[in-house]
């Protein structure tokens, strides 16, 4: 099929789709988002939409499926929950003023690991996307992880032994994982149903990652963020992650907090079997029972989603003797201050649903 045999609209669609081949393209046309070709057939199968066809000039008719703009969030949610990426392509000029085909651009791409809608998020759990970079030094026995929850702005840089990747991934439960194409990193079984996205190897380059981090946090040196010269694998993972997020959000990278850096020995590594047998956050009776009967259910007296997420993190990553205690306040003063703070936080929290999100 030649480009000249297609209608101008379908030529525009093809040009945009070629830049987002790994996503289902929601192509805005008036009050509907239309999907064509393979996207239409996939959406018809997954969402139960009626599959029709559209005239394409001198070329063959193309498969077509559409959803109303007002109902689109629900359809996007269902696709993302099934592990698909969805690129939202909007009309970026007034159709009444357009000369020829209305100009359109992809304004965002929603993936399992990069989502803001409450419909796609569990308030009591983080929604992490993780980039993994194998260290070039030390025989490749160390990996650097950059984990971000764009819905809360949390960013973690984690230095881990390759052999502890399984418990680490079980703790983070990422929805999406970024790897360099051809990477030797073997993903553990605990990654569950995470979407795996392969990226070009150069995107994990440490010098580029250093520039990305400096630009993101507006600093001249990463030392103030706690990043050391030997952290090239952490920096490489962070750079790949930031570049991917920038690609998904052309209008600008989401606001991220200063990175939390985790070093080996700071927290206890709990593998999948240990987590399950101790029933820390999931019952042995199955996922359908939620957290009932678990350690989480016994300890959880949180009043806000933020507190619920933090408690879950603490249970899955208990501090070891290598973690530094908080200094500056005596134990009794800390307890009294904590009680006053929590009392006020409960009152304030009742008026806010989930401020970080």
PLM features: residue spans?
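Charged catalytic and DNA/RNA-contacting regions of genome-maintenance
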Residues: 1-357
